[in-house]
UniProtKB/Swiss-Prot annotation:
Heme chaperone required for the biogenesis of c-type cytochromes. Transiently binds heme delivered by CcmC and transfers the heme to apo-cytochromes in a process facilitated by CcmF and CcmH. The keyword Cell membrane applies. Residues 133-177 are annotated as: Disordered. InterPro entries: CcmE, CcmE-like_sf, NA-bd_OB-fold. It comes from the Bacteria. Keywords: Cell inner membrane, Cell membrane, Cytochrome c-type biogenesis, Heme, Iron, Membrane, Metal-binding, Signal-anchor, Transmembrane, Transmembrane helix. It is found in: Cell inner membrane. The keyword Phosphoprotein does not apply. GO terms for biological process: cytochrome complex assembly. The lineage of its organism: Bacteria, Pseudomonadati, Pseudomonadota, Alphaproteobacteria, Hyphomicrobiales. Residues 1-7 are cytoplasmic. This is Cytochrome c-type biogenesis protein CcmE. GO terms for cellular component: plasma membrane. It comes from Methylorubrum extorquens (strain PA1). Residues 29-177 are periplasmic.
Length: 177
């Protein structure tokens, strides 16, 4: 074998190993990729039953019904379409009607979204980016909010007021190292 043919075989072998590694990475990731959809997209695209995705929107006013054993039924809307949701488990503390959420789960044959995870917003101005983008694309986005946080820092509690007097003195020393 000549030097040139050995070099070509080495390059081909490296390329094959790289292609195999890339294929394994992509196949491993395909099971963990979850797409985001708004209620309008679910209605328009006819999502096949059993497809796993994230559903984002606002909890429709008057739709929350709590059942036995932590079963909760509610509807998610983006003002164009509404999708009924069933969830079993503890809801986040910030979950309430009219607030933005993202639920992850599957759509059943009857068109009910069966969520296994529900994430709620974290303050009065937050909306999941995907939900905001979907509302903007539909022309239903409203900038700003009617409530604003006070801008006067003097109304905030002093930093030392929250410190308990029974704190472990060694904890501060360990955390400073």
């Amino acid at each position: 074998m000549t030097r040139k043919s050995r070099r070509l075989i080495l390059i081909a072998a490296c390329g094959a190993v790289l292609a195999l590694a890339l294929g394994l990475i992509l196949s491993a990731m395909s099971g963990s990729i979850v797409f985001f959809r708004s209620p309008a997209e679910v209605a328009a695209q006819g999502v096949p039953p059993g497809t796993r995705f994230r559903l984002g929107g606002l909890v429709k006013d008057g739709s929350v019904k709590r059942g036995p054993d932590q079963n909760v039924e509610f509807a998610v809307t983006d003002t164009n379409a509404t999708v009924p949701v069933q969830y079993r488990g503890l809801l986040p503390d910030l979950f309430r009607e009219g607030q933005g959420i993202v639920a992850e789960g599957t759509l059943d044959v009857g068109g009910v979204f069966r969520a296994d995870t529900v994430l709620a917003k974290h303050d009065e101005n937050y909306m999941p980016r995907e939900v905001a983008d979907a509302l903007k694309a539909q022309g239903r986005w409203q900038e700003g909010g009617s409530k604003e946080a006070p801008k006067d820092a003097s109304k905030a509690a002093p930093k030392d007021a929250a410190k308990p007097e029974t704190a472990d003195a060694t904890l501060g020393q360990r955390s400073e190292r």
